[in-house]
Amino acid sequence: MLGVVGVVALAFAALCLTAWLGQRRLLFPASKLGEEPRMEGATLTKVTAPSGRTVYALHVPPKKQGSVTIVHFHGNAEELGQLTPLAWSFRRAGLGFFAVEYPGYGLA
């Protein structure tokens, strides 16, 4: 009986250790490769910060001048290349769309 309990305890300890060591990848899954957003009428701008880091921004102007532009900051598991459908939705509604890629994500 003690042998079975020991094996279960060892397996549980191994599972806990694996979860602890891989917690950053479990909580903050990063994309494998940054995908450049492709959308008609969109502008992808590359800005180099004073620190030397590169930041990208996606701008889709509104259909009519003077219309509202939505500023969007994506979540941890997203990147600019995945925001094209969202940008299209706002564009169809007559709104502009502006999003910035966080340093270390996607294209940056």
What is the role of each PLM region?
Residues 50-108:
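Membrane-embedded segments
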Residues 4, 8-48:
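An N-terminal hydrophobic leader/cap segment in hydrolases
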